[in-house]
Amino acid sequence: MNIPFFTSVLMSLVLALLAMAFYTLMERKFLGYFHLRKGPNKVGLMGLPQPFADAIKLFVKEQAKPNPSNQTPFLFAPTMGLVLALLMWVIYPHSHQSFFIQFSVLYFLCVSSMNVYTTFLAGWSSNSKYALLGALRGVAQTISYEVSMSLILLSSLIILSTMDFTKMFSYSWILFMFIPLAVVWFITNLAETNRTPFDFAEGESELVSGFNVEYSAGLFALIFMAEYANILIMSLFTSVIFMSTCASGMASDLVLILQTITLAMLFVWVRATYPRMRYDHLMNLTWKSFLPLSLALLMMSIPIAMML
């Protein structure tokens, strides 16, 4: 039994949860300033313990389980979502990585594609028409945008000739070659994580709260812990694939962290700026715009890779 290995992985997961907690605080602070008001500032020093106060409040509440719901998948779906989000953090490509996966990009695609099951299970098992409609929207949206996401990732892999995130660290020029690819990738990430302007799985103005309408207390917290952990890991992988640096050691880790924070702040900026799209516009965007563009960039990447 490799004790240092498990200790390293456990520390990565604990720090990922801490990062997720403070990211929720950062989002609330930023949204407050966007709305010309103060964010959370009453709990402790400048509101810093606010995420932990929220977590304690939610997890000590009684869990209400609707009688018509299918109990086992209803309880299992939020836990599954958080576990899948944390599984992606295992391949965090820092300079002293202990968990080495040669095909980490393939691992990332496999785990991220499983997230659709958590949305579907949560909506279907709630036995509520609003939750089911939100789940069906979320499933259709996620599957549609995964096609473009896979093609964009494939274009990057053809040029970089590696499926290992740690080796992608040394390539710093792909963003300048494929700026349209990076923009489409970021918009696809917004759809994959169900964030504004693609938050149709929730759709408060139409579906009360969407697929999570029947959830409360700790299970509700688990759903949103998974969502924010996914946002951070998507920001991290965007930094690795498109914004890698030539620096090494501690400097590369620091640059990666700063890039990830910047991209995570961009998620908040988009939420504060744009309204929710119409659902038919969402589907037209991926099938009529992103898919042809992704295929065109994929065809361009093959001769570029041959010339390098």
UniProtKB/Swiss-Prot annotation:
Example GO BP: aerobic respiration
Protein name in the entry: NADH-ubiquinone oxidoreductase chain 1
UniProt-listed PROSITE patterns: COMPLEX1_ND1_1 (PS00667), COMPLEX1_ND1_2 (PS00668)
UniProt-recorded Gene Ontology molecular function terms: NADH dehydrogenase (ubiquinone) activity
Coiled coil: none
Membrane topology, record value: Multi-pass membrane protein
Keyword Transport: yes
Places the protein is found: Mitochondrion inner membrane
Catalytic activity annotation: a ubiquinone + NADH + 5 H(+)(in) = a ubiquinol + NAD(+) + 4 H(+)(out)
